[in-house]
Amino acid sequence: MNIYVRNLSPEITRSELLGCFEKHGEVSDVTISTYKVQGTSKATGFVEMPSKEQALAAIAALQGQDLGGNLLVIKED
């Protein structure tokens, strides 16, 4: 299941986002969206989890949680 994450702090790394979701199950991919020219974060990302049940549990657990000073906004993509 693909999960859309927004309101990411610009300093958050792929490995930090991965670490948050790994606590709730298997993660197959993590991507943080960046502007091509500047290479800076768009404050959004995608997390792919093979298990829908684990993905829904991760969304419920992480919705509104603080990560790097920003409150996460998460939904199914």
PLM regions: where:
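Canonical RRM/RBD RNA-binding surface and closely related RRM-like beta-sheet modules
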Residues: 1-76
